[in-house]
Amino acid sequence: MRPSGRRPDQLRRIAFTCNYTKHAEGSVLVEFGDTRVICTASVEERVPPFLKGKGSGWITAEYGMLPRATHERTGREAARGKQGGRTMEIQRLIGRSLRAALNLEALGERTVTLDCDVIQADGGTRTASITGGYVALVLAVQRLLKSRKIKTNPVHGQIASVSVGICQGVPVLDLDYAEDCDAETDMNVVMNDAGAFIEIQGTAEGHAFRRDELDAMLRLAEAGIADLLLHQQEALDGCGIKS
């Protein structure tokens, strides 16, 4: 039995609150159980220097946690004067994943920045950020379409992410903090709605995992992401948007 009482193949409660903030072109509060992340998508009419004059847009991301998002207060990285390696790794992952959802040329020479701010952490903050970030990105794109800044919808694929792992010898889906701490293997998977993999990050913590265990985890991830895609669609449908 998992600490939460869930089945091995069961997601936590998933919820999206769209248009959560006032000013951003797209925003959502995403909840994976007790993990809560505010994702905002901000559009700027410029691109990084390496893309100037090339007719292509860009998607990037920043990630952070409130000091008391965790069990004990964690000092702000800004106060230390630099970002930690974990933060940089996660925000690069978010950016890479969400770039796979768009035709960047159809976006035009503009940048969309996804800010993913964890207000409460209970495992899976990066997967929640990617899954919620997609919803915020679609909302921002709809704003661009309505204002006629772009002519065609650049979104060509739906993206979601989930964690899987092996806990006490059993492959499980969507690990919370308690499971993440004790997991023998921890893996983050990003997929699109075509069933293709965008990124797989996996590490053996307690002991090496076998090929059959890897296959079992990937099957769990595929099923979990299929459910997450439906949750995303329902949230966007509630805003009158067909993703």
Swiss-Prot record:
Keywords: Nucleotidyltransferase, RNA-binding, rRNA processing, Transferase, tRNA processing, tRNA-binding. It holds the Pfam family RNase_PH_C. Its EC number is 2.7.7.56. Phosphorolytic 3'-5' exoribonuclease that plays an important role in tRNA 3'-end maturation. Removes nucleotide residues following the 3'-CCA terminus of tRNAs; can also add nucleotides to the ends of RNA molecules by using nucleoside diphosphates as substrates, but this may not be physiologically important. Probably plays a role in initiation of 16S rRNA degradation (leading to ribosome degradation) during starvation. This is Ribonuclease PH. PANTHER family: EXOSOME COMPLEX COMPONENT, EXOSOME COMPLEX COMPONENT RRP41. It comes from the Bacteria. InterPro entries: ExoRNase_PH_dom1, ExoRNase_PH_dom2, ExoRNase_PH_dom2_sf, PNPase/RNase_PH_dom_sf, Ribosomal_Su5_D2-typ_SF, RNase_PH, RNase_PH_bac-type, RNase_PH_CS. Gene3D superfamilies: GHMP Kinase, N-terminal domain. It catalyses: tRNA(n+1) + phosphate = tRNA(n) + a ribonucleoside 5'-diphosphate. SUPFAM superfamilies: Ribonuclease PH domain 2-like, Ribosomal protein S5 domain 2-like. GO terms for molecular function: 3'-5'-RNA exonuclease activity; tRNA binding; tRNA nucleotidyltransferase activity. The gene is rph. CDD domains: RNase_PH_bact. HAMAP family: RNase_PH (MF_00564). GO terms for biological process: rRNA catabolic process; rRNA processing; tRNA processing. It comes from Methylococcus capsulatus (strain ATCC 33009 / NCIMB 11132 / Bath). Belongs to the RNase PH family. Homohexameric ring arranged as a trimer of dimers. The keyword Zinc does not apply. Phosphate binds at R86, G124, T125, R126. It is an enzyme of class 2 (transferase).
